[in-house]
């Protein structure tokens, strides 16, 4: 299976039990910042934004004072799982990022998708990739 099909079929798909509800954007990005696959709507990010995200995974809380920036959008960092998941909020939407051994799985959402639904979609794929040694 190609990385693009993971994005298309597992991240940008309808959310279970909520036909028509799906993430706004999604991507799988290597720890080095190289994009493995992304939805057409995933924002163009700057290397320093990805560096900040990786730093927060290695030193949890790093982004709390400044916020998480991706594609010029600032998200307020909310409770996550230290070293494993970063969650951010902006207005009626937000972002979930799951770290695997080699990649970061990104999901961006807006209402009517809920934070919990985004977390479920992103973390399920991230957990699967971890199980596969990725």
UniProtKB/Swiss-Prot annotation:
A motif (Involved in PIP2 interaction) lies at residues 84-100. Disulfide bonds join 13-118. CDD domains: PROF. The modification Phosphothreonine is found at residue 114. It is found in: Cytoplasm, Cytoskeleton. GO terms for cellular component: cell cortex; cytoskeleton. Occurs in many kinds of cells as a complex with monomeric actin in a 1:1 ratio. Binds to actin and affects the structure of the cytoskeleton. At high concentrations, profilin prevents the polymerization of actin, whereas it enhances it at low concentrations. This is Profilin-4. It comes from Olea europaea.
């Amino acid at each position: 299976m190609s990385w693009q099909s993971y994005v298309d079929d597992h991240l940008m798909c309808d959310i279970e039990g909520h036909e028509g509800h799906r993430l706004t954007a999604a991507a799988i990005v290597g720890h080095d910042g190289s994009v493995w696959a992304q939805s057409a709507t995933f924002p163009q990010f700057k290397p320093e934004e990805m560096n900040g995200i990786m730093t927060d995974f290695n030193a949890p809380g790093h982004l709390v004072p400044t916020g998480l920036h991706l594609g010029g959008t600032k998200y307020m960092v909310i409770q996550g799982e230290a070293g494993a998941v970063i969650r951010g909020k902006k207005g009626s939407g937000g972002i979930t990022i799951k770290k695997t051994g080699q990649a970061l799985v990104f999901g961006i959402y807006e209402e009517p998708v809920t934070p919990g639904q985004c977390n479920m979609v992103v973390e399920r794929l991230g957990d699967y990739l971890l199980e596969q040694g990725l």
